Amino acid sequence: MEFLFGRRKTPEEMLRQNQRALNKAMREMDRERQKLEQQEKKIIADIKKMAKQGQMDAVKIMAKDLVRTRRYVKKFIMMRANIQAVSLKIQTLKSNNSMAQAMKGVTKAMATMNRQLKLPQIQKIMMEFEKQSEIMDMKEEMMNDAIDDAMGDEDDEEESDAVVSQVLDELGLTLTDELSNLPSTGGSLSVAGAKKGEPSAALADADADLEERLNNLRRD
């Protein structure tokens, strides 16, 4: 059928064809307008020539031709402007048609995605995922408890002893630093010779020094 009657043109092809016809018409009008403008210049020159020769009747006739020619030039300018406006409208239609085709493609793609994304199946997958995650968490917790029961007691006891020793060492250093700054009346305390890890001895020396200072105050 296309071979007999010809292929049916698409809207975009028809728009391009009309656009080419309008551009051709504008070029032809430009050529005609230029011819009229050249003729206008020639009439003006002839009017000046006849006026110098005193042939006023001829001047009046050519003046009418000049007015008529200028009107034609103006009409060609107006017609070209109208054709250009139509050409711009056709260009706008082409742009809108291109936009419509793009939106049509996007719509088809969205419809395809909506058909593929079946909500019940996705919900089922998510529920199964949550179920398997909970099972995995439970198994991991059971394995950790079993490992802690098998290995955790001795390690915890050793770690606790290490923490206690560290705290006592730090407390002893702090008390030693404070005692070294206290003033003494009966002689200086031997703080420099204190050993780390003996906070009880440092506390006893501090109590004795404080008691001695209180006795001195009572005597005064």
From Swiss-Prot:
Keywords, in A-Z order: Coiled coil, Cytoplasm, Endosome, Membrane, Protein transport, Transport
Cellular component GO terms held in the UniProt record: late endosome membrane; nuclear envelope
UniProt keyword Chloroplast, yes or no: no
Residues of the signal peptide: none
InterPro entries reported for this sequence: Snf7_fam (IPR005024)
Sequence motif MIT-interacting motif, residues: 208-218
Disordered: annotated segments: 179-208
Cysteine pairings via disulfide bonds: none
Keyword Translocase recorded: no
Lipid bilayer topology: Peripheral membrane protein
Compartments, as annotated in UniProt: Late endosome membrane; Cytoplasm
Pfam families: Snf7 (PF03357)
Gene3D superfamilies cross-referenced by the UniProt entry: 6.10.140.1230
GO biological process entries: exit from mitosis; nuclear membrane reassembly; protein transport; vacuolar transport
Coiled coil: 12-53, 199-220
Quaternary organization: Probable core component of the endosomal sorting required for transport complex III (ESCRT-III). ESCRT-III components are thought to multimerize to form a flat lattice on the perimeter membrane of the endosome.
Family: Belongs to the SNF7 family.
Function of the molecule: Probable core component of the endosomal sorting required for transport complex III (ESCRT-III) which is involved in multivesicular bodies (MVBs) formation and sorting of endosomal cargo proteins into MVBs. MVBs contain intraluminal vesicles (ILVs) that are generated by invagination and scission from the limiting membrane of the endosome and mostly are delivered to lysosomes enabling degradation of membrane proteins, such as stimulated growth factor receptors, lysosomal enzymes and lipids.
Protein's recorded name: Charged multivesicular body protein 2a
Organism: Xenopus tropicalis
Species lineage: Eukaryota, Metazoa, Chordata, Craniata, Vertebrata
